[in-house]
Amino acid sequence: VKLVMPRGSEKLYRKAPGWNHFFGEVKQAREVCNPEACLIPTPMDLKVNAKAAPLQVAGNWKIVAADGLANEQEHAERILKERVEQHKDLKKGGQLTMTLALDETLADNEAYTLDVQQKGVVIKGKTAAGVFYGLMTFDQLLRGDASKVGCDAIPQLSLKDQPRTHVRELMVDPCRIFVPYEDLKAFVPEMARYKLNMLHLHLVDDQAWTIEIKKYPRLTAEASSRWGMDDMLMPIKGYYTQEQMRDFVAYCAKYHIQVVPEIEMPGHEVAAISVYPELTCQGVQKPIRTTCGVSDELLCPGNDFTYEFLGNVFKELADIFPSEYIHLGGDEAGNPALDCWTYCPKCQALKKKLGITTTDRSENWKLQGYLFDKVIDLLRTQYHKTPMFWYETDFKKI
């Protein structure tokens, strides 16, 4: 088999200096950016004045920010330092001006307007978040495409934008493959660039427990390391301390991103079960999983320790994560579904107490509903949290 391709074309696919996972590398700057090609997501309304002289971005910039926008001013300074050739003294001012202001007439809390003029840029937002998203749009215009190099000029334009949805989430799973803390932080500015506003941390699964719980130190001491997934003969280990997570939450807040922790239940809990087998119906210790798939090891809804354990875990999480949301998982609860509860005396006693007359697995889902109802009531009444779940979970209190 002979591969036919232009001579030298393989060089186009080599990793250039400065390459990373988030953007490609372009060696030469574009002269004038094309807003319609470089803005992701597409703004709600964009008008480009192609006949007017474009904004030449190289120069000394002056930033004028309204009260309450100190964080956004810092981001503006960072963007200009990273993207613009001449920026020797941003505070002293110069030929170009960036104005950051609030506009209460805008309809949505995350709405903003951006006007590019020949001598500068005006960004207005309903709130500081709106101003921030305007800055992220300006950053994309400065890049001109997906590169670090950027453009020499931006056409004069008027842009109005607001989110199509208010939950724009990225999920990161440090359980299957642990993500070191500094690498986790690297996701944040790239999320913000595309106006994602929620980082869903999948902290618990069959393969690892990755968040420090001071009430239960054995969780991270014994359940945060294992051999690699699916015959990868390399150790996987690591967890986040509470101090790291508090720092991470504060770091994300600067990018208007909230962090939502997830604690799976009743399935995907083998890591915890490996340390505390009394969480299950059988009370038998099981090893941490080193493969994907669905485990039939579940938390026992008829066991008082299950609720004691979850209550203590959520008490500490509520103190770390100020987000209004906590994710409770709920997916893939056993294979066959919830079958281990069929033969559990505690679960059968709970069924009888709840007036469930079947003894087979046909109504075991009602026990899952009972488990979630108790946890949801705890989260809402004591910690004022709103629960989130995977799509297959459907109970009236959710």
Feature map (PLM): residue ranges:
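Active-site neighborhood of glycoside hydrolase catalytic domains
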Residues: 272, 277, 289-290, 294-398
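Extracytoplasmic/secreted cell-surface and envelope-processing proteins
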Residues: 11-14, 73, 209-211, 268-271, ...
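Alpha-helical structural signal in soluble globular domains
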Residues: 16, 83, 251, 255, ...
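Acidic, contiguous N-terminal accessory segments
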Residues: 31-166, 358, 378-381, 388-396
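Short, solvent-exposed loop/turn elements at domain surfaces
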Residues: 11-14, 70-74, 107-108, 177-180
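Solvent-exposed loop and capping/linker segments of extracellular ligand-binding repeat ectodomains
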Residues: 1-31
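Feature activates predominantly on carbohydrate-active enzymes
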Residues: 106-325
